[in-house]
């Protein structure tokens, strides 16, 4: 029995945990920022990083793509654990081949789902079966919410070991001023994804963190431009008011429908800055907001203004 225990301890010592993280996107990319956040936590726990570059992999042959991945997983040992953050925002073929490579090494795979592209964009919905197949090949899947899990089960997901993230953490390493109550709403996001910003005519000003060059000049908006995390936290806490988590569906982007299933990084950003929340009444975190007294959920933007 002694040699069995020693052999098992030796296997545990040799086993390593790896975590993927994407590179090559804009520093403003929430996809890049959120993967880096998870990766940094993993590094603190002793995980080894596998960097994955974001690029046009359609220009590569299968062999070239395979060679690239061999370099990414060069430090992988048989039986190691890999936390695979998805999507990589490369092609579905890329993610599938990467999973093939991991399984060929006998890796145990924890797939950490940040977003599901086929559920975000109507034109990509046809890829959902392939994405679910990748989840089914994983040993463990971390999903944003139970609502998303329920939906995926209806579409064929069978993985038995599933964890729910529910809410993003947002570590802050600086001292922030205590926000004061102000009759303002703050919002951050791309105007192409959230066009309601351009139609803002309410009597309460909207403080907008994003590209203000395309804003309607008649809108009641104070555009402050894009800010990095530290600047954003300081600005939000200094100006006070409420953080607005709002989305609406349109032809190609089903933002509102998707918000019922995903975990909003924006919500956690506002909370980390000390701002209460005003959000769509059907946002996935509505119960979390209500149970902890973190703000209000409303059905219309007019109601959001009234709550302020």
Provide a role label for each language-model segment.
Residues 1-56:
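N-terminal subdomain of nucleotide-sugar transferases
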Residues 296-302:
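Conserved acidic donor-binding segment of nucleotide-sugar-dependent glycosyltransferases
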Residues 168-238:
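Conserved catalytic-core segment of nucleotide-activated headgroup transferases in glycan assembly
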Residues 59-150:
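Extended catalytic core of nucleotide-activated donor transferases of GT-like folds
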Residues 139-153, 157-174:
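Donor nucleotide-sugar binding/catalytic pocket of nucleotide-sugar-dependent glycosyltransferases
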Residues 228-273, 279-287:
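Nucleotide-sugar-dependent
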Residues 286-296:
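Acidic, glycine-centered active-site loop in nucleotide-sugar glycosyltransferases
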């Amino acid at each position: 029995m002694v040699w069995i225990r020693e052999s098992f301890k030796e296997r545990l010592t040799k086993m390593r945990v790896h975590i993927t993280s994407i590179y090559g996107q804009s520093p403003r990319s929430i996809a890049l920022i959120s993967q880096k956040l998870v990766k940094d936590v993993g590094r603190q726990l002793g995980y080894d990083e596998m960097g994955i570059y974001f690029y046009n992999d359609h220009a590569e042959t299968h062999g070239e793509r395979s060679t690239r991945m061999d370099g990414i997983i060069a430090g992988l040992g048989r039986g190691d654990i890999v936390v695979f953050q998805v999507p990589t925002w490369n092609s579905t073929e890329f993610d599938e081949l990467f999973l093939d490579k991991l399984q060929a090494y006998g890796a145990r795979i924890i797939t950490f789902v940040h977003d599901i592209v086929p559920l975000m964009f109507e034109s990509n919905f046809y890829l959902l079966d392939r994405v679910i197949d990748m989840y089914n090949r994983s040993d463990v899947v971390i999903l944003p919410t139970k609502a998303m899990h329920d939906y995926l089960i209806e579409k064929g997901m069978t993985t038995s070991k599933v964890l729910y993230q529910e809410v993003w953490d947002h570590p802050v390493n600086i001292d922030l001023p205590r926000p004061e109550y102000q009759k303002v709403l703050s919002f951050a996001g791309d105007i192409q994804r959230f066009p309601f910003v351009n139609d803002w005519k309410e009597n309460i000003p909207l403080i907008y963190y994003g590209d203000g060059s395309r804003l309607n000049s008649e809108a009641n908006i104070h555009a402050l431009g894009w800010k990095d995390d530290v600047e954003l936290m300081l600005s939000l806490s200094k100006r006070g008011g409420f953080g607005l988590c709002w989305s609406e569906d349109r032809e190609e982007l089903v933002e509102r429908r998707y918000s019922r299933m995903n975990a909003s990084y924006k919500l956690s950003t506002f909370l980390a800055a000390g701002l209460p929340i005003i959000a769509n009444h059907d946002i996935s975190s509505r119960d979390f907001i209500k149970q902890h007294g973190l703000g209000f959920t409303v059905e219309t933007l007019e109601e959001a203004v009234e709550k302020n």
